[in-house]
């Protein structure tokens, strides 16, 4: 597969933010999203989309002190995953960098260089997962697809 990568800074870019993922996902493909959590943030989300479906939904919720992961197929959400190896990895008012690595069986997610979870693929046609969406209570500063 192609190792095409874009590294584009987006200073003070308004969210929601959408961009295409060239060639879709494949094992070893990584995506990086960096920004600053707003000081009054309730939640934000990073979605990897496949048409109208959401293959991977990463949703830090400050009002619940949780990082929810899920998949939405045909407008129906699956079971939420919430377990983390440590405390909430995001803080209001602080910078963050999320690294999502696509593997053959799962997504591996790291925040600020620390692994926080694996999420098994529920939508299996990885090349069709070709859109990144970032929305919610953050200032987006950098995206690499």
UniProtKB/Swiss-Prot annotation:
At the top level of its lineage, which domain of life is listed? Eukaryota
> Looking at the keywords, is Acetylation present?
yes
Q: Where is the Galectin domain?
A: 17-145
Name the SMART domains on file.
Answer: Gal-bind_lectin, GLECT
| InterPro entries, per the entry | ConA-like_dom_sf, Galectin-like, Galectin_CRD
Under the heading PROSITE patterns, the entry gives: GALECTIN
**UniProt keyword list:** Acetylation, Lectin
Q: Which SUPFAM superfamilies match?
A: Concanavalin A-like lectins/glucanases
Q: Which GO terms describe its biological process?
A: negative regulation of CD4-positive, alpha-beta T cell proliferation; negative regulation of type II interferon production; positive regulation of gene expression; positive regulation of T cell apoptotic process
Task: Please list the residues that carry the modification N-acetylserine.
Answer: 2
Q: Tissue range of expression?
A: Erythrocytes.
Xref: Pfam families: Gal-bind_lectin (PF00337)
- Keyword Glycoprotein appears in the UniProt entry: no
Residue numbers binding a beta-D-galactoside: 77-83
Q: Which GO terms describe its molecular function?
A: carbohydrate binding; galactoside binding; lactose binding
Q: Which CDD domains match?
A: GLECT
Q: Name one GO cellular component term.
A: cytosol
The task this protein performs is described as: May function in erythrocyte differentiation.
Subunit composition?
Answer: Monomer.
Record-given protein name: Galectin-5
Q: Which gene encodes it?
A: Lgals5
């Amino acid at each position: 597969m192609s190792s095409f990568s874009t590294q584009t800074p987006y200073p003070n870019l308004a969210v929601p933010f959408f961009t295409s993922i060239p060639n879709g996902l494949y094992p070893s493909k990584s995506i990086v999203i960096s920004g600053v959590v707003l000081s009054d943030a309730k939640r934000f989300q990073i979605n990897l989309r496949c048409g109208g479906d959401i293959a991977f939904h990463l949703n830090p919720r400050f009002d619940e002190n949780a990082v929810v992961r899920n998949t939405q197929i045909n407008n129906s959400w699956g079971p939420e995953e919430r377990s983390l190896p440590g405390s909430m990895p995001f803080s209001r008012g602080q910078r963050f960098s999320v690294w999502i690595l696509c593997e053959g069986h799962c997504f591996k997610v790291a925040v600020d260089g620390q692994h926080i979870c694996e999420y098994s693929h529920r939508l299996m046609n990885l090349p069709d997962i070709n859109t990144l969406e970032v929305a919610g209570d953050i200032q987006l500063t950098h995206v690499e697809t």
